[in-house]
């Protein structure tokens, strides 16, 4: 939502048009109070869908346009994987090359270990047979970057109203065009509406009386009827509190963001007991 407002304001400004009073952002609570403020903050291009990869290549250019203002750290990203993921990661690398996205792909257990030990001489992960090292990307400090986005939008004349909850929409008669946005603080007339609600998009889908069930055609062209439009999976994430200094590279620098997936057995460093023999990641 904030990035859309920022870009729309840029378009109007470049065209010599007034922004104030024309772009309004409504936020139910406050800036960064939702998923954007608590998600992992990783900026990467490690996606299987080509469309997503092109989108992220574009987005990283935006991050790079103002690292300080957006609290962005361009340290790069690494996908360190076991053999079960080798083919898929190789395809991602191939498609990254096709859009001139800078990355390095290391294959083979010995070559992967050698590559990682250039960064960390005490590297000891087991079962690794490939490393995809994206030279672009890195991470951003979530809340700070969201406030940076808000600042960019407001400086161009965008009005951000917090503490306002959208309750529904009023449509033009005999039309699907939205005439007003109904909030718990009154109605706002508008010409266009952008819904940037993240995981809460289902609520707005229902407000717009859009279908709860859809038909989906799979890759083999089989049609699956009456599939739920929205399905939510519960994801549990954990944070490990460690001294940042112990994760520096051999030359004392901040390392890339590193994601390791392996099927090597995971043992407790407390009592040596087996935690899992299934694939796990960190």
Residue ranges and their predicted role:
Residues 1, 24:
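Beta1/beta-strand and adjacent pyrophosphate-binding region of the FAD-binding site
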Residues 3, 44, 169-282:
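Flavin-dependent oxidoreductases
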Residues 7-17, 22, 28-103:
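Conserved FAD-binding subdomain of flavin-dependent enzymes
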Residues 28-29, 135-136, 163-164, 184, ...:
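Fold-independent oxyanion-binding glycine-rich loops
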Residues 55, 59-63, 145, 149, ...:
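Alpha-helical packing segments of well-folded alpha/beta enzyme cores
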Residues 65, 84-162, 167-177, 182:
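Flavin (FAD/FMN) cofactor-binding and adjacent substrate-gating region
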């Amino acid at each position: 939502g904030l990035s859309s407002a920022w870009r729309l304001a840029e378009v109007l400004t470049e065209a010599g048009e007034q922004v104030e009073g024309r772009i309004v952002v409504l936020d139910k609570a406050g800036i960064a109070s939702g998923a954007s403020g608590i998600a992992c903050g990783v900026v990467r291009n490690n996606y299987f869908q080509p469309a997503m990869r092109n989108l992220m290549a574009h987005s990283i250019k935006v991050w790079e346009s103002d690292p300080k203002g957006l609290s962005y750290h361009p340290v790069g990203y690494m996908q360190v994987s076991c053999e079960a993921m080798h083919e898929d990661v190789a395809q991602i690398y191939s498609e990254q090359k096709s859009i001139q996205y800078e990355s390095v792909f290391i294959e083979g257990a010995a070559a992967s270990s050698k590559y990682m030990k250039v960064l960390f001489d005490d590297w000891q992960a087991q079962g690794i047979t490939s490393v995809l090292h994206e030279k672009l990307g890195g991470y951003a400090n979530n809340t700070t970057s969201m406030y940076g986005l808000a600042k960019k939008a407001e400086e161009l004349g965008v009005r951000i109203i917090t503490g306002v909850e959208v309750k529904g929409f009023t449509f033009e008669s005999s039309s699907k065009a939205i005439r007003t946005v109904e909030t718990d603080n009154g109605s706002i007339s508008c010409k266009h509406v952008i819904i940037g609600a993240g995981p809460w998009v289902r609520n707005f889908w229902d407000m717009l009386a859009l279908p709860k069930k859809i038909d989906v055609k799979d890759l083999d062209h089989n049609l699956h009827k009456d599939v739920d439009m929205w399905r939510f999976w519960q994801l549990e994430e954990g944070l490990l509190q460690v001294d940042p200094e112990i994760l520096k590279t051999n030359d004392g620098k901040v390392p890339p963001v590193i994601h390791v997936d392996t099927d090597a057995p995971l043992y407790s460093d407390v009592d040596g007991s087996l935690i899992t023999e299934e694939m796990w990641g960190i």
